[in-house]
Amino acid sequence: SVVKSEDYARPSYVDRRDYPLPDVAHVRHLSASQKALKEKEKASWSSLSMDEKVEKTVVGAAMFFIGFTAILVILEKRYVYGPLPHTFDKEWVAMQTKRMLDLKMNPIDGLASKWDYEKKEWKK
């Protein structure tokens, strides 16, 4: 059998988190229905059928309401909700954790079971 080598003259597609939308198409060989859809994308909006116009309107309305909801959430977080309680401060959490360790709370399988009381450090 003959091994086919990759064409390195063309850009290659790789799924990576740091580059989510590469310049390469996900599908290299389009089917007949996909080619027809590509040609339809180039046409005018007025050439759409009534069902397609209704579908476009529904999707547009859904996106509008999702965006409006996002704006409401941002405004609520900024102007409605107050600041976080002092118990969320890092210093408070550190004091609370130290107190839990001093009281040896849940020594079997909890936080105190992972603390070495002789060395005063977390077990490894």
Curated annotation (Swiss-Prot):
The keyword Transferase does not apply. GO terms for cellular component: mitochondrial inner membrane; respiratory chain complex IV. It comes from the Eukaryota. One of its GO terms (biological process) is mitochondrial electron transport, cytochrome c to oxygen. It is a single-pass membrane protein. Its main location: mitochondrion. CDD domains: Cyt_c_Oxidase_IV (cd00922). The modification N6-acetyllysine is found at residues 4, 35, 42. The modification N6-succinyllysine is found at residues 4, 35. It is found in: Mitochondrion inner membrane. SUPFAM superfamilies: Mitochondrial cytochrome c oxidase subunit IV. Keywords: Acetylation, Membrane, Mitochondrion, Mitochondrion inner membrane, Phosphoprotein, Transmembrane, Transmembrane helix. The modification Phosphoserine is found at residues 31, 33. Component of the cytochrome c oxidase (complex IV, CIV), a multisubunit enzyme composed of 14 subunits. The complex is composed of a catalytic core of 3 subunits MT-CO1, MT-CO2 and MT-CO3, encoded in the mitochondrial DNA, and 11 supernumerary subunits COX4I, COX5A, COX5B, COX6A, COX6B, COX6C, COX7A, COX7B, COX7C, COX8 and NDUFA4, which are encoded in the nuclear genome. Belongs to the cytochrome c oxidase IV family. Component of the cytochrome c oxidase, the last enzyme in the mitochondrial electron transport chain which drives oxidative phosphorylation. The respiratory chain contains 3 multisubunit complexes succinate dehydrogenase (complex II, CII), ubiquinol-cytochrome c oxidoreductase (cytochrome b-c1 complex, complex III, CIII) and cytochrome c oxidase (complex IV, CIV), that cooperate to transfer electrons derived from NADH and succinate to molecular oxygen, creating an electrochemical gradient over the inner membrane that drives transmembrane transport and the ATP synthase. This is Cytochrome c oxidase subunit 4 isoform 1, mitochondrial.
